[in-house]
A protein has these predicted regions:
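Generic structural hydrophobic/aromatic packing signal, biased to beta-strands
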Residues: 14-19, 40, 57-62, 83, ...
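Compact nucleic-acid interaction/catalytic patches
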Residues: 32-35, 41-77
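Residue-identity detector for glutamine
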Residues: 10-13, 49, 128
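Short N-terminal edge-element motif at the start of the domain
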Residues: 1-43
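C-terminal terminal-subdomain/extension
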Residues: 1-4, 30-32, 71-158
Length: 158
């Protein structure tokens, strides 16, 4: 098993796992295994901590998006994110909030991140906002939702 050295780890939040890591760690997308993408969700500070303090790394299993969905970009949707990766390959990826899993830090350390694609600093900030928005959002009571859907509610006239 690989050792952990906080000063030498290549792993950072927002990096993609290479296909050999995805396969070895059994992280295939449940519906689109041939289009699987896995992104590191854990914060850099947590990644730097020793395995005794932070034994796992959170990742999100996603896929290559067939096309960009504007309703899922810029962290507008708390459940789904479409985000662009650039570099040698430029493509859109889709990640769902419910597809977050934990990976053993030492197991992941046996592998290197996917080198040819990255998130721009702006897209990385969007990814962080999306992670936070899953837990920091307004909860509307059922009665509020019901009233919005009433046909005689004034919003329906506009």
């Amino acid at each position: 098993m690989a050792e952990w050295n906080r000063d030498e780890t290549q792993w950072r939040q927002g990096l993609l796992l290479a296909s050999d890591a995805v396969e070895a760690l059994g992280l295939d997308h449940s519906e689109f295994s041939e289009r699987t993408l896995v992104i590191v969700a854990s914060h850099d500070c947590d990644l730097a901590q020793s395995p005794e303090k932070e034994p796992h790394i959170e990742v999100v299993i996603g896929r290559l998006a067939p096309e960009k969905d504007g309703n899922s970009t810029h962290a507008k949707n708390a459940r789904k994110l479409h985000i662009e990766f650039t570099g040698a390959d430029t493509f859109w990826a889709e990640f769902e909030a419910t597809a977050k899993v934990k990976v053993d830090k030492l197991e992941l350390n046996r592998f290197s991140p996917r080198p040819e694609t990255t998130l721009s600093p702006e897209r990385h900030a969007v990814f962080q906002m999306r992670l936070a928005s899953r837990y920091r959002r307004s909860a509307f009571p059922d009665e509020f939702e019901r009233r919005l859907n009433l046909k005689d509610f004034k919003l329906h006239e506009r």
